[in-house]
Every structure is written in C-alpha cells, then in structure tokens.
C-alpha cells in the first residue's frame, strides 16, 4: 500500500508576531486556537503563500471584510510581514519518503504601493535532523539571531553534501516540481489552474459552499479527456498546420512573387538604366570622337572652300569685266543686224516698187492707147447720135401734120416707101444710079470689101501712127532715162551720154557680179578671224587654267601627254571604282554579318546565362552539348534514386502516421469497430479499463492478456449470445470477457510470472506463454510513450522526407532547367562568342572605313586630276584644229583687203541695183537718141483721111445693107399706089421716123456705153498715173533711206550679221551663264563657308560639351562601377543582351518597371523613399543604391529556417522547391484529416458515460457524510438538452449538414459551432467566434450540467444553496465537495506521474467554531477515512482530544510584539507528547 505524502511542518520567519516559528502539522487535523488577533489567520496566510506564491491571487481578508474589494491595498500580505527578509517554508515528506522543503522568501518593497517581493525555492535531500529554522537563521548570541538572505541560504546549502537548492523564476516551474514530488494534487500549468487551486483553498479556508466552486464544478471535478482532447487537438493541430501550411504556401508564394516581382522589376529598372548609361557612355565617347573627326574634317573643308572662294571670286571678276565688252559688242551686232534687216526690207521694197513701176508703166501705156481708141469711138458715136437726132427731129416735124392713124396698107406703103428711100439713099451714097434691090446684095459685098479694105488701111495707118507716136515716145523715154541716170542734159547730148552710161553700166555690172563671191570670201575670212580670236581666247584660258603659258608648238606634245595621263588616270579611276566597290561590298558584308551577329547575340547571351545558371546549380562546367546531354542522363538516374529513397521514407512515414493514428484512438482501441461493438454489447474495452496502467506495468499486462488485450468486458455473456449470431462487421478474432467494468481485476487468469514473461493457464490443458513486449502499447502511458517515440521517429522521417523531397524537387527543377536549356538554347549555347566576332568585325569595319576614307581622298584627287586632264584635252581638242589659224598672221590684212573690194563691188551693185533697169531700158532704145522723129504730123493727116474714107465706106455698106434688108418691102408697091399722095408721104415719113428713132436709140445707147467705157478707161488711166507717181515718189524715198542707212543689203549680209550676233550672244550667254554659275557657286560657297563656320562653332561647342559630359559621366560612372563592384551586383545589372536595345526601348523598359515598383513597394516606406531618390536622372548611383536596398530588403525577408541561402535569386528557386514540398505536405495531411461527425458524437457520448460512472463512484463516498440536518450529499450530472440534440444530429442526421463539414472554408470546430447555431437559433452566442464556440463544443464537460444536492431532513433531496442550509451545514457540505474535488484531481493526475506517489491532501477551515460537535466529528472521520490533513482555526479548543492543537496568544513585551504558542497533541488514546519546538502548557515557550 502506497503511503500518502504528508505536510510535516510550517515555518514562519520574521512574520508579524513570529520571528522563527515552526508548526508541526498533525497527520489528520491541526487546530489553531486563540483569540482575536492571536495570529491564526497569519499562520494560515503563511501556509497559503508558500503553497501558491502568486501575488495576483493572494488576498487575505478578515471575515468582516467579506465581499469588500478595496479594504486593503496590499491584500493583507504586506501588513503580516516584518521589515527585512521573511520566509514561509513547508516541510513535506512524499510517498517515496523523500523530504522536500518548499517555501518562499518574502520581502517588503519600499514605497507607497506596499508591494511584496516573493521568490519561491525548494530544498531536496535535507537530513531529517536539520530543522527549517536552522537553515534560514544564524544565531548571534543567546538571545539574538539573524535571518539569512536567499543568496546566503544558497551558499549555506551548497556546503551541505547531498542537499539540492533550487530557486525558481516562474511559479509554473515551482508548482511543476511540487506536483512531480507529490506535494500538490494537480499540475498547475497556467494561471487559470493556479486560480482554481487558490479558489479551492480559499473556499475551504472561509467555509461554506463557494459560488466560484459551485459554478465551475465541471472544471474542478470533470477531468479533461486527454484522449479526446488530444485527438481533437491533433486534428485541430493538423488543421492549424494545414492553415499554417496554407499560410506558408501563401507567404512563400507571396515571398516568391514578391521576390520575383521585386527582383525582376528592380533588375529591369536598374539594369535598363545601367545598360542605358553604359550604352550612352559608349555612344557619347563615339560621338565625342565623331565630333572631333568631323571638326577636323570641317576645318579642312572650310580651308578648301576658302581657297575655292578666292579662285571663283577672281574668275567672277574677270567674267564681270568681260561681260561689259561682250554686251557692247552684242548690242552693236544686234544693231547691225537690225540695220541689215532694215536695209534688206528697204531693198525688198525698192525692188518690189520698181517691179510695180515697170508693170504700171506698161499698163499706163496700154491704157493710153485704150483711152485714145475709146475717145475716137466716142467722137464717132457722138457724130452718129447727132445725125440720128437731127433726122428724127426732121421727120417728126414733117409728120407733125400727118394722120396719126394708118392701116396696114398704109404701113406697107410706108415700108415700101422706106425701102425706096433706102434704095435712093444707097444709090446716092454709093454713087450707083443703077442700083436695084436685086443687085444690092452684090454691091453690098463689094462695098463691104471696100469697107474692109478701108478698115485695114485705117488700121495700117493707125499702126504707123502708133509707131511714129512710139518712136516719138521712145526718144522721149530714152531721153528721160538718160536724164534720170545722168541728170539734166541737152537733147543733143543725150546720145553721147547714153553710150557712156551704157559702157559704165557694163563695168558696174561686172563688179556687181563679184559681190557674192567677195562676200562669201569675206565671210569665210571673217569666220576664220573669229575662230582665230576664239582660239586665242581658248589658248589664254587654257594657259590660265594650266597655270602656265604654252607656245603653239608645245600644244601637240602637251595633248599627247594629257591623253596618256587620262588613260592612266582612267585606269586608276576604273580600278579605284572596282576597289571601292570591293571595299564597299566587303563593308556591306561585314555590316550584314554584324547585324546578323547582333540579332544572334541576345539569343547567345541568354543561352550563356542559362548555361551559367546550370553550371552554378550543378557545379559542373560544360564545354559541349554532349556533356549537357550526358549530365542530363546522370540527373535522371540521380532523380530516380532519390525518388525511390523518398518513396521508401514516405512509406515508412505513412506507416508511422498510421500507427500513431491507431494508437491515438480513445480507449486504446486499434480497431474502430471494437468501439461500436462495445457500445452495442453495453460493455467496455479491456484496454479502456487498463487505460491508466503505468508504463512499468504495461509489459506485464500486455503479456498477461496477450491476444485478448483488445477484448470487450461485458457484464453478462449470456445476454449477448444472441447478438453474436450473424455478426460480420467485426475483427477476425473477437474476445469477450465477463466481468464488472467498474471493479474488474486480473483474477480471471491463473498466471505464473517468469523473467520478462508470463505463463497463463487458460485451462487445464492449455497454457499460453507470452514474453513481455519490448514496445508495449497496453495502457495510455505505454501508448503515449510509444506515440512519443513514433513522433520522434516521424520527425526524423519527416525531416529526411523533406530533405529528400527538397533534393528531388531540386533535381527535378534542375532536370526541367536542363530540358528547357536543351530545347531552347542547346543549338546556340556552344557556338562561338558573337560579341567577340562582332568586336573583330567592328575592328575590320573601322579599318575598312579608314581605307575607304583614304581611298575616297585618293580617288577624289585622281578624279580631280582626271577632270583637269579631260578639260585640258577638251580645250586642246578645240585648239589643235585651229593651230594654223593661230599661226596665220596675215588673216586680218586679207580681211581688210577683201572688205575694200567688197565695198567697191557693193557700190557697183548698188549702182546696178539703182540704175540697172534704166540702163536695161535705155540699151534697146539708145539708138533712137541719134535723131528726133519729123513726119509725125503727116501721118496724123493721112490717118484722119483714111479714117474718113473708112467711115464713108461703112455708111455705104450700111445703106446697102438696109436696102438688102428691105428687099421684101419693094413688093408693097400696090399698097403705095392705093394711098393718096398724102398717105404715101405720111407713110414714108413715119417709116423714116421709125428708122431715125431706132437709129437715134442705137446711137444714144452706143454713145452712153462708149461714154461710160471712156470714163472708166479715163479713171483707170488716172488711177494708174496716180499710182505710178506715188510709187515713183516712194521709190525715190526708199532709195534715199537706203542710202541714209549706209549698210550693204546683199543676200548674205543678214546671215553674217545674225551669225555674228548669235556668236556674240552665245559668248555673252556663256559668259553670263558662267558668271551666274560662279555667282551661285560663290553664294553657295559663301553659304557653305558660313554653314561650315557655324558648324565648326557648333561642333567645337558640342565637342567641348560632349567631352565635359564624357569626363563628368566618367566620374559618375566610376562611382557607379565602384558601388556595383563593392556590392557584388555587377553580374545582375550588366545584362549584355540589353546592350542591343535602343535608349528609348531601355527607357521605356525602365519606366514600366518604375511604375510596377511604385505599386509593389507602396507599403514599404524605406524602399519607397530610396526609389523616390533613385528617380533623379542625374544621380545614377542612387538607382544602384535602390537595387542594393531591394536586395538587402529581400535578404532580410528570406526565411533562414527553410531557405539556406542569402541570395534572393537563389532563394526564389528554393521557394519554388519549398512550395512544391508544402503542397505535397498539405495534400498528404488533408488525406489524413478525415474525421466523421458520428465519430465525434460517439467519442463525446462515451466520455460522458464514463465520467457519469466516475461521478457516481464519487457519490458513493459521500453517502455517509452528514452535517446537522444534512443526511447525505451527492453530485447530480445531466446532459444538457441542446447538447444532447447536437449529439443526436451528429450521430444520426449528419448527412443533412454535410454542407458545413465538407466546406473547405470551415474548420471542424467552426462547422460544429455553425451546426449548434443552426439547431439552437434562440441561443445568443454573444461576441464569441465560431472557432471558440466549436472548441467549447468539442469539450465533453460543456455537455454536462452539475449541481450539488443534499438530503436534508424531511425536505428530501434539494439543491445545496447557502440560503437553504445553516452555516455549519453549508461548511460541512462545502468541505465534502472540496474533498471530492481533491480526490478527482488525484485520479486525473495519476496518469501524469508515477503510481508510487500519492499526493498530499490538506485543506483549511477558518472559524471552525461555527460547526457543532457532530459536524466536527464528521470532519475528523472524513479526514481519517480519506487520509486528509486539515488545519482548523477556532477561538477555543473545539476537539483537543484529537489531532494536534496549538494555543496562540499575542503578547507585547518591551515594545516588542510576539505570539506565544503552546502545542498539545490529542490525548484521547494516549498521553500527549511534547512536540518539537514547543513546551507543555505548564511551561510555555516564548519566542522573540
């Protein structure tokens, strides 16, 4: 039988009234008696302080202060102490007979807050002979002693062999030691546990039914179901781990995304700016060099332009000087051409007028003849008209008196008479008396012939007259011609002068015929002269251009020399062109190759970066694609091996997890079906009965029961026989044992215990030998021990699994990286460095550019020489054909000579032109000038006579014709005879009148017509004369004007003048064109010089600015490079692929990254400030500072517990691996979190049943307790209705609420709380969260309602309330409940410490006088039966015959207050013994 631990004594050092007092405590009841202020409460306060040294709980109040909250500032402890060091120590001996002294050192703290400093300590291994007061006091003399400080106490104990001194910094450690050594009944892990313990002590101290205890009986009596709690805790822990894992995944993802985002954007932001500055620095250097080259080139160009400007200005001056003379010559030539054209027009007019005059003269002569003939005819017609008029008048007068009306006969008679009259007239006129009408026709022919002859004679005379008249006119005309040519002269001199003029005209005509040959000869000579002058000008210009004077004889040799030079230069230019083409072709090929390499360089650089990363990750150097593929095969093999090992570790880990899960089942049931069967059969699992077996006994009981250790203990086997029929859902071997689950023991077997084994005699003929298992799992302690070892193993396996998973992930990522590299970069990674090739090609390109520049200069010079030689040859080609002209020195004299001859010929031509017609007219008639015509008058008379004869012959012929016409009238003789004489006469007169009127009409008509014709002829003659005179005057004027012009107007004059003018115009135009070209070229040259000057100034300014910028940038760049190298970020920032992007692209890249960074670090004030500072474009080093700050920030964010690197870039990869591991871990854990609501309900219900049974067992111990009218005390335990409904729903209707338990957003606790709220909507949950409510619902104690009931008198069982009980009954009832609580605590704590320790049991009772003797006796009996120590305080001795009684009296001696203590043991069975440290009542001891 294990002895219960006891408190041996209480020691007070330097308390108020107690300097060094030790109270030996009785094994049952210790009574402190004394009056008011004797020190009873102080003694109990010292005990409680040593037991619970928590200033937040201690509150020592008087009974009169009950309910007061502010009666004492120090809660009663400060005033119970003396100044200086104070101690309160408890001397105990536990079940193992170990002496343990625990206590506290107290000391008042100076100040108005009246604080107390408490230091708990413990002493082990102290010999029994050493008293506690000897430890903490030092005797100075017989009456004086000194209290040792805690440090002195420690030093003192250190000197004692085997004694251990422990000082505690926390109350939890202090209580943990007291629990382990069996001083207190419960492990006080927290302030809540200490509060419960203190409230228990306080309730026992002041007595009665404590409301604090009553309200929380569940917490005091119902132990925490560690199995259920642990299961739920494991589940919740797993859920929390899931949440933590999810949070870790989220954080890792966030960190990874943050790292990726920050590194990516910061790298883009800074690297783009870094590379842009690097590119700009290179560009600025190139620009500075280009500016310098362009500056030198521009200076050379300016000097060349200045020389060119001087040459062109000089040439322009020469052309300006020549232009004036050329303009004057051109104006003179134009004027001369105009004069020639005017003279030619005058000459053409003169010739046209002369031709017109000749034609007019001919027409005038003809018209004179026509007018003369018309005048003669007019005279004849006038005469005939007069005769006819006379005849009519005469006939009219004769017929004035005749009849006016005649008949036909009269008419015929008249016609006859007229015919006779006509015949008579014909006879008269023809002098033919014998003329008859019949012979009239013959005579008519005769007289017509005579008329014809007369007419011919007239015509002959007329011709003669005309000839004579012509001869007369020819003389006059010839005379006029001579006078016109020679001027006025005598008619007698006309013949001599005419001959002289004709002879001179022949000579002049001969000279005039030489005008055209002479003119052509002169034109030819003048052309040659002009060519000679042009040749001289060309020669002078050639010499000027060549800068040397050449003789004519040297030109041919110079021409040959220039031809040879042209040939050589042409070959050079041709070869230079080919060479330039080859150089340019090579340059284009180089440029194309460079462009191709520049396009390929970023790809190659990316491949190299990837290859370098692979090399860094695997620690290998690769030089060929074959090595990469071989290493990839090695990676595959390594990955396969790592996966195999990981799977093995994972399988073992899963097995451990399954075993842990199996061992963690409530009641030790490894098979869940056993719990259901036990509940079905109304039994209890054997493992649950032995659940509290110790770890040392576990192997024995495991071997004892063997395979039946998983049996079900049932009250009666016969009652379950029927239930076994048809049972299928059970293990293969189901063991059933009959027995009482509440009082089951191992007496069912006959057992012989051997060494580490047992022999179980199952029957007479069946034994079972079972060895003690090396790893027992029978009992909670064994299972927990096994679970603990499995957890340790699982930790090792988990760490190994995590390491292997990490390695596998790393290998897989490395394999993926190699695969990506092979797919993307393998084809280019091992090619030659394109940048090195670009540098080589750039060097070659520079050489080619230099060669091209040199070649261009040489070619330009050769072209210039070639052009000069070509110009020289061209000039010589124009000069060489004119060398004979240049050598002809007499050409100008011959031109003058021919010009004189031409002038003479032109004078003769002008004479011939002026008088040639007169001479031509004079030459045929010059002979008429020898004599004047004399018979012109005789011819006129003969012509008049002949004209009269012709007129007479015409009249005769007319008369005969009339007779012939009237021959028919001669037959009207009878009509004439019939008429009287008057009638015949009238008839005849009428006939004659008619004839006369007809003749008169004919004469008038002829006269009118001839008069009109004569008038017309006269008008034509007058107009001809007028026109002739006018043109004659105009001709004279034109000849005078032609003479006034003074220009030869020959046929070639205009052509020569025009040719001369055109030549001069061409020269002038050429001169002007050249001058304009020179002016434009000069203007352009000046503008070019001005542009070059401005360009030079700008280039000098730009060059100096660029040079200053380069120098400044170099200093800043050096600082940037120093900062980059010092911080080791050059590899991150010097991204060579960015060197191939333009500045705009890099700036855009940097700006985009800047915008992303502003959003990414908006919550980080430090990085935000650094980023804001880095935006200054003039301070590029601040961007490096920002990049370093980002890296430093990321390094600080790296979780060193999971990431083994300081490099954020490498941390990203490890984060990826960690994410994969966490995801796998989360997946595996989620698969193990399946817990059903039915299981939860069964566990809670079974736990409730077990605890109800335990409470019933506790009630059995209280049935015999009675106080006053209270006959019995019991605890009533019921399940709350709302919670019972919850359990029913969880067990039977969980399918209706799977929306809660299957939700990924809710934990099981939260789902349980939601279900409780759903089932009980009327209950107000307050401000508590679903998680808090759910955790409460997972605790079975919250399902129970507990209340204390008493069987009092005739009232029967009723709720124990202070108002319904007397004071003594209430104190007794409360004490009974407290004893039950302590016993419950001991049962709960038994599994937490060894079974060989039974803890101390001690309660307090102040003011015990309120109990009667029977109640006191009941307490004594209860203490004896429960082996409980009790300290009672009472004013008087209530039961001195039992236990130990101390009499306390407070006295004052010499201003010193002390308590006089007298101890007395119970005297009922034997005489009291004097206790150590006390005296008998007769000899009281005093302490000072």
Curated annotation (Swiss-Prot):
Belongs to the SMC family. MukB subfamily. The hinge domain, which separates the large intramolecular coiled coil regions, allows the homodimerization, forming a V-shaped homodimer. Plays a central role in chromosome condensation, segregation and cell cycle progression. Functions as a homodimer, which is essential for chromosome partition. Involved in negative DNA supercoiling in vivo, and by this means organize and compact chromosomes. May achieve or facilitate chromosome segregation by condensation DNA from both sides of a centrally located replisome during cell division. Gene3D superfamilies: 1.10.287.1490, 1.20.58.850, 3.40.1140.10, Immunoglobulin FC, subunit C, MukB, hinge domain. Disulfide bonds: none annotated. Keywords: ATP-binding, Cell cycle, Cell division, Chromosome partition, Coiled coil, Cytoplasm, DNA condensation, DNA-binding, Nucleotide-binding. It is found in: Cytoplasm, Nucleoid. ATP binds at residues 34-41. GO terms for molecular function: ATP binding; DNA binding. Its main location: cytoplasm. Residues 326-413, 444-472, 509-602, 835-923, 977-1116, 1209-1265 form a coiled coil. This is Chromosome partition protein MukB. The lineage of its organism: Bacteria, Pseudomonadati, Pseudomonadota, Gammaproteobacteria, Enterobacterales. Homodimerization via its hinge domain. Binds to DNA via its C-terminal region. Interacts, and probably forms a ternary complex, with MukE and MukF via its C-terminal region. The complex formation is stimulated by calcium or magnesium. Interacts with tubulin-related protein FtsZ. One of its GO terms (cellular component) is nucleoid. Pfam families: MukB, MukB_hinge, SbcC_Walker_B. One of its GO terms (biological process) is chromosome condensation. NCBIfam families: PRK04863.1. Residues 666-783 are annotated as: Flexible hinge.
């Amino acid at each position: 039988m294990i002895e219960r631990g006891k408190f041996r004594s209480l020691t007070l050092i330097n308390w108020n009234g107690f300097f060094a007092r030790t109270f030996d405590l009785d094994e049952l009841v210790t009574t402190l008696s004394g009056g008011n202020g004797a020190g009873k409460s102080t003694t109990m306060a010292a005990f409680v302080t040593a037991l619970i040294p928590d200033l937040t709980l201690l509150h020592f109040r008087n009974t009169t202060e009950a309910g007061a909250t502010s009666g004492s500032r120090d809660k009663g402890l400060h005033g119970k102490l003396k100044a200086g060091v104070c101690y309160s120590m408890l001397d105990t001996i536990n079940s193992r007979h170990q002496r343990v002294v625990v206590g506290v050192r107290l000391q008042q703290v100076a100040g108005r807050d009246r604080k107390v400093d408490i230091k708990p300590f413990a002493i082990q291994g102290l010999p029994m002979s050493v008293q506690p007061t000897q430890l903490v006091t030092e005797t100075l003399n017989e009456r004086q002693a000194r209290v040792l400080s805690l440090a002195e106490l420690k030093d003192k104990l250190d000197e004692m062999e085997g004694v251990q001194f422990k000082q505690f910094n926390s109350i939890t450690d202090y209580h943990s030691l007291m629990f382990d050594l069996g001083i207190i009944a419960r492990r006080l892990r927290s302030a809540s546990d200490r509060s419960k313990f203190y409230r228990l002590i306080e309730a026992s101290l002041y007595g009665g039914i404590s409301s604090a205890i009553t309200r929380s009986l569940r917490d005091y009596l119902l132990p925490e179901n560690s199995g259920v709690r642990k299961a739920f805790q494991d589940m919740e822990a797993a859920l929390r781990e899931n949440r933590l894992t999810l949070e870790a995944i989220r954080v890792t993802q966030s960190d990874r995304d943050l790292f990726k985002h920050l590194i990516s954007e910061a790298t883009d932001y800074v690297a783009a700016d870094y590379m842009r500055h690097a590119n700009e620095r290179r560009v600025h250097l190139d620009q500075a060099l280009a500016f310098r080259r362009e500056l030198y080139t521009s200076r050379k160009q300016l000097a060349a332009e200045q020389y060119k400007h001087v040459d062109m200005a000089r040439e322009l001056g020469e052309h300006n000087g020549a232009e004036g003379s050329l303009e004057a010559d051109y104006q003179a030539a134009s004027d001369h051409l105009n004069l020639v054209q005017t003279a030619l027009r005058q000459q053409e007019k003169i010739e046209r007028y002369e031709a017109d005059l000749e034609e007019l003269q001919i027409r005038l002569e003809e018209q004179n003849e026509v007018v003369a003939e018309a005048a003669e005819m007019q005279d004849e017609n006038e005469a005939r008209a007069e005769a006819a008029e006379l005849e009519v008048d005469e006939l009219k007068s004769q017929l004035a008196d005749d009849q006016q009306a005649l008949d036909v006969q009269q008419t015929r008679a008249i016609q006859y008479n007229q015919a006779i009259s006509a015949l008579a007239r014909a006879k008269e006129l023809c002098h033919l008396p014998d003329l008859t009408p019949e012979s009239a026709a013959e005579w008519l022919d005769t007289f017509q012939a005579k008329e014809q002859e007369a007419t011919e004679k007239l015509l002959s005379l007329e011709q003669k007259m005309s000839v004579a008249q012509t001869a007369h006119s020819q003389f006059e005309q010839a005379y006029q011609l001579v006078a016109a040519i020679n001027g006025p002269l005598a008619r007698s001199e006309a013949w001599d002068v005419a001959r002289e003029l004709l002879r001179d005209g022949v000579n002049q005509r001969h000279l005039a015929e030489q005008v055209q040959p002479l003119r052509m000869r002169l034109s030819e000579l003048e052309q040659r002269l002009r060519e000679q002058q042009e040749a001289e000008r060309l020669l002078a210009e050639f010499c000027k251009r060549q800068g040397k004077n050449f003789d004519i004889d040297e030109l041919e040799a110079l021409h040959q020399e220039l031809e040879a030079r042209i040939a050589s230069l042409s070959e050079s230019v041709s070869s230079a062109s080919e060479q330039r083409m080859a150089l340019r072709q090579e340059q284009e090929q180089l440029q194309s190759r460079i462009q191709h390499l520049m396009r390929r360089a970023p790809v190659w650089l990316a491949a190299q970066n990837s290859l370098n990363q692979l090399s860094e990750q695997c620690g290998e150097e690769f030089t060929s694609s074959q090595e990469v593929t071989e290493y990839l095969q090695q990676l595959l093999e390594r990955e396969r091996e790592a996966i195999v090992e990981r799977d093995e570790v994972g399988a073992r880990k899963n097995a451990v997890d399954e075993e842990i899960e199996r061992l963690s089942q409530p009641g030790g049931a490894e098979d869940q079906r056993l719990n259901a069967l036990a509940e079905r059969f109304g039994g209890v699992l054997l493992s649950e009965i032995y659940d509290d077996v110790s770890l040392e006994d576990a192997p024995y009981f495991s071997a004892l029961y063997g395979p039946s250790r998983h049996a079900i203990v049932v009250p009666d086997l016969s009652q379950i026989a029927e239930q076994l029929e048809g049972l299928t859902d059970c293990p293969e071997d189901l063991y059933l044992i009959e027995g009482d689950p509440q009082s089951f023991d191992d007496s069912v077997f006959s057992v012989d215990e051997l060494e580490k084994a047992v022999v179980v005699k199952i029957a007479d003929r069946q034994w079972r030998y079972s060895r003690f298992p090396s790893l027992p799992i029978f009992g909670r302690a064994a299972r927990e021990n096994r679970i603990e070892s499995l957890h340790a193993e699982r930790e090792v396996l988990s760490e190994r699994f995590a390491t292997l998973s990490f390695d596998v992930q790393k290998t897989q990522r490395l394999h993926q990286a190699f695969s990506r590299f092979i797919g993307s970069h393998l084809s280019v990674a091992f090619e030659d460095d394109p940048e090195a090739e670009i540098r080589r090609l750039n060097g070659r390109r520079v050489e080619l550019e230099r060669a091209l520049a040199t070649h261009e200069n040489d070619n330009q010079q050769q072209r210039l020489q070639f052009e000069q030689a070509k110009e020289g040859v061209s000039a010589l080609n124009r000069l060489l054909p004119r060398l004979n002209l240049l050598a002809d020195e007499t050409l100008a004299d011959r031109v003058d000579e021919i010009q004189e001859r031409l002038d003479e010929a032109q004078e003769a031509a002008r004479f011939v032109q002026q008088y040639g017609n007169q001479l031509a007219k004079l030459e045929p008639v010059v002979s008429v000038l020898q004599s004047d015509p004399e018979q012109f008058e005789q011819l006129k008379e003969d012509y008049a006579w002949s004209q009269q004869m012709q007129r007479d012959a015409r009249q005769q012929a007319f008369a005969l014709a009339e007779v012939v016409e009237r021959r028919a009238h001669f037959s009207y003789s009878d009509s004439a005879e019939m008429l009287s004489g008057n009638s015949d006469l009238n008839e005849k007169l009428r006939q004659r009148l008619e004839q006369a009127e007809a003749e008169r009409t004919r004469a008038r008509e002829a006269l009118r017509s001839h008069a009109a014709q004569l008038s017309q002829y006269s008008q034509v003659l007058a107009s001809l004369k007028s026109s002739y005179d006018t043109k004659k005057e105009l001709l004279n004027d034109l000849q005078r004007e032609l003479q006034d012009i003074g220009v030869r107007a020959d046929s070639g004059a205009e052509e020569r003048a025009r040719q001369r003018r055109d030549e001069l115009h061409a020269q002038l135009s050429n001169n002007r064109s050249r001058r304009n070209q020179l002016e434009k070229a000069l203007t352009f040259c000046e503008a070019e010089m001005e542009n070059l000057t401005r360009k030079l100034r700008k280039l000098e300014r730009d060059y100096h600015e660029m040079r200053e910028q380069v120098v400044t940038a170099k200093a800043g760049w050096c600082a940037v490079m120093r900062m980059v190298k010092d911080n080791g970020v050059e590899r991150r920032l010097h991204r060579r692929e960015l060197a191939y992007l333009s500045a705009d692209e890099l700036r855009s890249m940097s700006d985009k990254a800047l915008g992303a960074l502003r959003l990414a670090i908006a919550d980080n004030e430090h990085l935000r400030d650094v980023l804001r500072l880095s935006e200054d474009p003039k301070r590029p080093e601040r961007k490096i500072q920002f990049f370093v700050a980002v890296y430093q920030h990321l390094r600080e964010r790296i979780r060193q517990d999971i990431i083994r690197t300081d490099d954020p870039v490498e941390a990203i990869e490890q984060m990826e691996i960690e994410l994969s591991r966490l995801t796998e871990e989360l997946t595996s854990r989620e698969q193990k979190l399946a817990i059903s609501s039915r299981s939860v309900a069964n566990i809670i219900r079974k736990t409730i049943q077990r605890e109800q049974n335990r409470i019933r067992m506790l009630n059995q111990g209280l049935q015999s307790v009675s106080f006053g009218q209270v006959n019995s005390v019991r605890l009533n335990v019921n399940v709350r209705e709302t919670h019972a409904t919850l359990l029913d729903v969880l067990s039977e209707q969980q399918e209706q609420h799977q929306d809660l338990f299957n939700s990924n957003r809710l934990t099981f606790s939260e789902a349980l709380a939601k279900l409780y709220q759903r089932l009980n909507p009327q209950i107000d949950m307050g401000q508590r969260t679903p998680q808090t409510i759910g955790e409460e619902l997972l605790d079975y104690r919250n399902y129970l309602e507990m209340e204390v009931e008493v069987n009092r008198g005739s009232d029967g069982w009723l709720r124990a309330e202070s108002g319904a009980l007397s004071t003594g009954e209430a104190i007794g009832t409360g004490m009974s409940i407290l004893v039950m609580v302590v016993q419950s605590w001991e049962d709960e704590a038994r599994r937490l410490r060894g079974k060989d320790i039974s803890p101390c049991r001690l309660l307090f009772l102040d003011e015990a006088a309120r109990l009667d003797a029977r109640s006191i006796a009941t307490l004594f009996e209860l203490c004896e039966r429960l082996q409980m120590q009790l300290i009672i305080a009472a004013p008087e001795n209530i039961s001195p015959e039992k236990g130990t009684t101390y009499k306390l009296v407070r006295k004052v001696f010499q201003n010193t207050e002390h308590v006089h203590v007298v101890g007395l043991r119970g005297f009922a069975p034997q005489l009291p013994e004097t206790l150590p440290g006390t005296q008998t009542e007769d000899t009281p001891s005093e302490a000072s």
